[in-house]
């Protein structure tokens, strides 16, 4: 089959046809193998912790070379579509943060299910819905420490090739290491990488192949072979232009996902597609549509001509199969049979923990293949067994071992455990350490500049806080030696430090947005009330250190989870003070944060007068800080709390059952009992009256503030100042980012400590090398992508 897309002529070869060729990055425009192969890794290189695992051979992809007879009237085929998503470099079944094997993650585990499914029905299509090459220290290692070179294949894409994936679409996190890095990964891949809504900003052409027609030879119900032309396309959220603004601005544009699919389906039909599958890096969303929404899976399933949708991005599971899915409440959602708007839809969780399976019966009628019936389901990996795919483990062994050596490098020690079990309900050491490190680093970066005397604050959020129903998704670092794996557990994402110049009024709006983390509490109710808004992502709950403040939870949230103003007169932020005095809403502050926040649309941030992207990852700043301090005493300064007008309320929240071991000294938190969610428990928070309240001195300030800004009592306590070094940074040239100034500061000037070396030294996993020399090299490794290496979304 050949056809013409909007940006190029189709390329035909072997058993597959590329339906459109982008002008910028070509992926697999020939069916012939590429010369860009990765060296085969020996099984003897496999980590010792894995050699005793029970292993199986990899699933063998269905071959499509057989010459078949044309389809005939009444011919019936039973096809299955297999789907993975949001693998986030979980290739080997290993937890790099805990430094031990894990049976709850890994494509090496999912591959066992893929083989089983193909044995059940060889008429199989296999796709992935994105967020593949970023997410664990394995991803960091292959991007920054031992980066995949030009012409090499990323281990994740090599695994897809080995398993016979028919196509993969890109996710938002694919862009975290910069467009140049992604271009190199796409060119080195020997699988079909597709996307239909990212365009070249200069030409308007598709940046990637917008779709692929894959000729699949299936066996019909009578045992005869027949070829079907499966059209596969993919889309991702338009929000990548915000999340990776520094990487993408002026280089690409992004079409609305639903509109992009609507536009490409007729082209796929014209190219001969018998069946159209959308691999959407998009959550399911809901039944209400607004253009450029982050999650449009529901709407995509309703597009005429779309036959099936493999969703992702939200790290959720669909279908549940019993009508209990979160999405079951929406019209047109059949959670029992896995249908949305009459089409089979799956979302296969995250990290390889599920395989999506869509079963489709097709009959050839009136010259076309027509769907007779469809259904979808999820199959969970076997978490009780260590069975994994041997060939994938062998292929990844060299990079897997390199990652382990990298994360085991010691950088300091902690006198007490560092956990995030209670980081959403009280000021917490896990966030305090990040803020202390950011202040330590930023102070040196502004020393000797015109902004040297501006008040300096720091913002950080709890990244691992049981997000999306995962009771294992918390930071849990034991007392004792601290290694890079622990810092990666503490600071999950490959963000880059950034400085914002904002006013006191903007800081208040920033905190109002953060306060969306909490549900509104009725102070008069005697019924249990849940404190945490589960729909709000914990990585958006910024704690700003250098100030003191309280949250009034009797008030509604001012902004929704997307940052949209929903209650203009609401004011949850009270007693906002700097150095013990009510904050001046007109005063200018510097806030050190990360590039994800700095380039986003967060209230109070998006209108910052100046945004400076620095030259060092946040994680590396933490490493350097720990190296400098040598020993960390994990305590929080208690700079925020709740207004004590809910002291009689029964306030509950969920956290891991493992948090029970850390209740000692937590006089405001108590264990209630097990949760209905596996691995979680319910806890009670008691908000106590605070002593030493002082006279309300904020009235004059609030009179100057915009409508809705209200601040009352003030505490006498002065926020502790961070200990900083004495290095001096020179002013740097300025460039423009949107309407704000962006200053590229000189390469990070890390204070010299005993045993340190030149910051030009590359990272080294040898135990005899200096820790500082080993880690300072990450600065240079980061330079190529520092403009926007960031987190995601995760969702």
PLM regions with names:
Residues 1-100, 106-125, 129-152, 157-158, ...:
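Intrinsically disordered, low-complexity segments of exported/surface proteins
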Residues 50, 117, 167, 216, ...:
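Functionally constrained cores in energy, signaling, and assembly domains
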Residues 66, 151, 167, 197, ...:
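Short secondary-structure boundary micro-motifs
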Residues 67, 165, 240, 247, ...:
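Generic signal for short, ordered secondary-structure residues
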Residues 67-380, 449, 456:
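Acidic, metal/ion-coordinating pockets
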Residues 77-80, 90-98, 103-115, 119, ...:
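Catalytic centers of hydrolytic enzymes
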Residues 105, 129, 134, 170, ...:
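Short glycine-rich loop/turn motifs that provide flexible caps or phosphate-binding loops at active sites
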